[in-house]
Amino acid sequence: MSNKKEIVVTDWIKQNCHEGNFLNLTLSSDQRRVFRGKRKSDCNQELQLQLPREGKLNDGDILLTNQKKLFVQIIAQKENLIKITAKTSIELIKVAYHLGNRHVEIEINENILFTKSDYIIEELLRNFDVVYSKVEKKFFPEIGAFHHEKKSLS
């Protein structure tokens, strides 16, 4: 058991702030969608997230502790991914369709898709005229249409 006191993180600060004490908190794409629970900072400091349950934690977001004396910066963790490219846009769209149909998270960039490394996905990709390779990079998947961010549809 650690002798360090747990720090409670309660607020987002969207603007970049350079004053005060900082802790870095490196999180995977899955972990950046969870706003409550225990985490450990990069220097092993125990943190308790108690953030409003909306949106997502983005790479570079600055969070504030309940005592307003310490800042926590979110860092997107590098993950094992599959990079997918194709000769034509239509082939890449077909791959995106089939991945989405399987509820696979994808990051969409111009002429490139990224998804989490998985041998089943690699088998699927063999059925398409695409080039794919394993890479390690920060992963920023598209947010689904029905995520719980508060936005008006009008």
Curated annotation (Swiss-Prot):
Originating gene: ureE
Entry-linked CDD domains: UreE (cd00571)
Entry keyword Mitochondrion: no
Family to which the UniProt record says this protein belongs: Belongs to the UreE family.
Protein name as annotated: Urease accessory protein UreE
HAMAP family: UreE
Biological-process GO terms, alphabetical: protein folding; protein-containing complex assembly; urea metabolic process
Function: Involved in urease metallocenter assembly. Binds nickel. Probably functions as a nickel donor during metallocenter assembly.
Membrane-crossing segments per the record: none
Molecular-function GO terms, alphabetical: nickel cation binding; unfolded protein binding
Cellular localisation: Cytoplasm
Domain of life: Bacteria
Keywords for the protein's UniProt record, in alphabetical order: Chaperone, Cytoplasm, Nickel, Nickel insertion
GO CC list: cytoplasm
Annotated organism of origin: Prochlorococcus marinus subsp. pastoris (strain CCMP1986 / NIES-2087 / MED4)
